[in-house]
Every structure is written in structure tokens, then in C-alpha cells.
Amino acid sequence: WHEQWGGLPSEEFLTTLDPLLAGFRSRLFEKTETADKPVGKLSPEWAERLGLTTEVVVAGGAFDCHMGAVGAGVTPHTFVRVIGTSTCDVMVATYEEIGHKLIKGICGQVDGSVIPGMVGLEAGQSGFGDIYAWFKRVLEFPLKEIVGKSDLLDEEMKERLVAEACNRIIPALTAEAEKIPAEESTVIATDWMNGRRTPDANQLLKGTITGLTLGSTAPRIF
């Protein structure tokens, strides 16, 4: 959406991308609102479910990381890193600073999405916490397959042992990885396991881990 072309891309543009998009534009919205604008109040059903009143004001939606930046107190010339399953690096700039420039390499440049009346700028990586979760699942496999199916323990003991071991994987890796001097680390990774958000977003890219030797350990890979 951009006001320079009257909102959403034209029907011609969309059908050039894919003929199946014919007629799609006419069924979409025509107007956008920033998240500071109230759109209504809480319905009786949700007020009851949440234990709130129907006087609670409901605002429009926005990107989670953009709202995270608002919560962190983002202002012009400050940089906020919102870290979770992925990472989002968020800044805001005035219209005068941005002008008609399109900032290259970043994944988002949105008028009013972070702070109304300013341009929100977003970069980051598509995988962060998700990568830790993936590596944990890799290391969990033998625990669940071998210990979890062992005949040496009863079912309750197997479940408790597997659960305890799985829960301790990330803390144990963290403690050992902290002991490794940065100059001794020969393992290099491109963290694109979920594609690349910045620079130049490409969600089809894959991650790599290089520099592995027979001496590479789980903490060093971590």
C-alpha cells in the first residue's frame, strides 16, 4: 500500500504477478489507519472471556516488532532491537529525512507503522530463537528415540528423564559456550535457516555452518 499509487497496487500489476489474482484487488481494503486510532470497544463476549469491561478501547493492528519498538520507547535516531523467534532492528525517521528515498537492503519502510507521522524502518534476521529451538530438537533426537524407548526404565522415569535432559540442553550449551574464547572459535555460520531478512530479503536462502573439524563440539557449534 502506498498513497503515491492510490493505495494498493493496480489490478494490472497484480495480474502480471499471477493471473489467479484477477479481481483480488476489488475485494481488498481501500483505506489504512495507524495503530493509535481506536476502531471500537471490546465486545461483550471477549470482555467476559478476559475479565474486562466493554469500555476497553480496541486499536488497529500493527506488526509485533513495531509495537515492541514503541514499548521500548523508540524515538528518532534511536535503534531498537526486538529479539524473539526472529530479530527485528527498528528505527524511525521524519518525512524530511527520508524524502522520496527508498532505503536499500532493509526489509521494511512503512509510513506510520511504528510511530504515526513518521517512517518506520525495519531490518533484522528471519531466524533467532527459532534457530536455538531447531538445534535443541536436533540434539533431543537420540534422547527421545533411545532413552524414551528404553526397556531399562519404567514409563514415568523415562518421561521425567527425557524432559529434564531436554530442558537442560540450552542452559548447558550456553554455560560451556561462554568458556570458549572468541579467537578460538573456528566455526562460522550464516544464520539463514529461515531465509534472510537483511540485507536484501530472500526467504529462499539456506543457512550454513562451516569450519567444522573432528574437534568441533556441540558448544562450539552452538
Residue ranges and their predicted role:
Residues 1-23, 33-222:
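Active-site core segments that coordinate phosphate-bearing ligands/cofactors
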